[in-house]
Amino acid sequence: MSVEVDKSSHSKPKIEKKSKRNKRKWLNDENKTHVTASEAAIERLKKSASFSQAAQQALKQSRKEDNERDIEMQDVDAEAQPHDLLPIPQPSVEDFVDSKPHVKNITSVLPKWLAEPITVDPNTTVEFSSLNISSKLVERLQKQNITRGFAVQAAVLPLLLQDGRHGPMYSYGGDVCVSAATGSGKTLSYVIPIVQCLSHRTVPRLRCVVIVPTRELTVQVAKTFEYYMSGAGLQVCAWTGQKSLRHETYQLNGDENECRIDVLVSTPGRLVDHIRNDESFSLQHLRYMVIDEADRLLDQSFQDWVDTVMMEISHPKCLQNKSNILDLDQNISPTFLPDIDTLLPYRLPSPLQKLVFSATLTRDPSKIASLKLHNPRLVLVQNKDMEVDDGGEIEDDAIVFSVPPTLQEYHVSVSSEKPILLYHLIHSKNLTNILCFVKSNEAAARLHRLLELIHESLNQSFSCGLFTSSLSRDERKKIISRFATGDLNLLVCSDLMARGIDVANTQNVINYDPPLSVRSYVHRIGRTARAGREGFAWTLVQSHEGHHFSKLVKQLRRTLPIKRIKIEFSHISEEFVVAYDKALEALRVEVFNSRYPQQKSFLT
């Protein structure tokens, strides 16, 4: 028992001793921690004090500099004296030009083919017999009493005839863009070389597509091709959208699904319809693509026709998939069939040549780039001294406008009584074969009816017709035929007539409503003075329209200056005034009765 007690009594002091050692160790550690913390705090205080001292010194230095600056400003103010304003120093022109020698003028921004066009004087002519044209085509020209070509033909025909001398399978020239006044013979300048080139073909293929903006122009161009194709074994087809897609496909391929058309004339929308919806339609054999009235076609999307047509030309859908290639499995070993997904990599370069024509052809590279032209050349029919202004810059923001050299323009100042002033102008100047352009279909119909009522009141034989987009195609054809034969002396029309349509014997153009753009003006007045004939353009301008019209016509290049005349209401005979008042009242009654048929008795 004593042993156990002793063990317990001895173990207790050992525990106490160990506890004291741990306590002392803990205190030592705490003291060290406090010392370390104190030392760190002291170091931070020292650094803070040092920083504060440095900051104070920097602040003193800053205040000293501010004081010195204030003293300097006071000295300057004290010495300043009043004087005249002096120009701000500018870098010398020589230094600027030397530092950027490539900055010459705006023409350096354009591609070379746009900045350096082929310029032809409007008075240039050429004998067709002197060109490399076949005897058959020369004979067809002579039957139309055409022996000499105009300026655009003198410039374009040699280029295209040279490019097409090896037939439809080859092309050694680049694309061609042509800007010439309306009525200058642009259509004939591409019809002749295309017919001559394609006459050497062996197998019928769709080798030429002509894209035009209107149905009327489609028919007109197709008739021109048809006349000069006579005896050459070639076929032309016009797509206007009047027939179904199936019928037009039959025109192209017939019963045997073999192409039998060489030249297709179409509006852009109808062409896109066939590309997207007709599996048998293909442009893979094209030799020529003609874009007529290009300014209008490029300004409007027409179902994205440019991108759609360019894609079909570069990647024909008939070559995209081997399943579209007839009898492929019968002519190629089955071993190689799995490797043939498309024939595009094996396609030979296309001989396609693009021909772009317009009276107001843009020089905007961004618009022309969408056509993906290859080695293009630009032909301008204009006087060389009018090509650029005195500063060497392209006029009118890089757009070319020209007027037929045989056209005489008139600026006619009028008051608000325009219908009777128009009637007075026609009779006082003895005008005949007149196209009168009005801003809308409704305004054209109203003016046409008012002129008819004036004729009836005066018992005069003055025939007047109406031509607008609201008429059917057959009605338009009849109207144009009557005007061409002289049965109609005056044709009131909308801008539908202004685009490329060649109405025979048009001598006078009257702008009853001034056009809103220079392009519209050029295309309107281009209906007269065609093919070297004399023509006259009369624009009725009210006082509030004078500034706009004067600014518009300044953008045009012309041979003859504009003449100004003024017609006042006091110039009109009393007989015309009475007839005009009666016609206005009769027209008012007709309009009211057409709108309110149940109240006819109220006005009658």
From Swiss-Prot:
Which residues of this UniProt protein bind ATP? A180, A181, T182, G183, S184, G185, K186, T187
Q: Where is the Helicase C-terminal domain?
A: 406-573
Span of the annotated motif DEAD box: 292-295
In terms of one coarse class, where is the protein primarily found?
nucleus
Q: Which InterPro entries match?
A: DEAD/DEAH_box_helicase_dom, Helicase_ATP-bd, Helicase_C-like, P-loop_NTPase, RNA-helicase_DEAD-box_CS
PROSITE patterns the UniProt entry points to: DEAD_ATP_HELICASE, HELICASE_ATP_BIND_1, HELICASE_CTER, Q_MOTIF
* Domain Helicase ATP-binding residues, every copy: 167-379
* Positions of the UniProt region annotated as Disordered: 1-37, 51-70
Among the record's GO biological process terms, what is one? Answer: rRNA processing
Q: Partners and quaternary state?
A: Associated with pre-ribosomal particles.
The record ties this protein, via PANTHER family, to: RNA HELICASE (PTHR24031)
Family to which this protein belongs: Belongs to the DEAD box helicase family. DDX51/DBP6 subfamily.
Function per UniProt: ATP-binding RNA helicase involved in the biogenesis of 60S ribosomal subunits and is required for the normal formation of 25S and 5.8S rRNAs.
Q: What is this protein called?
A: ATP-dependent RNA helicase dbp6
Write the gene name.
dbp6
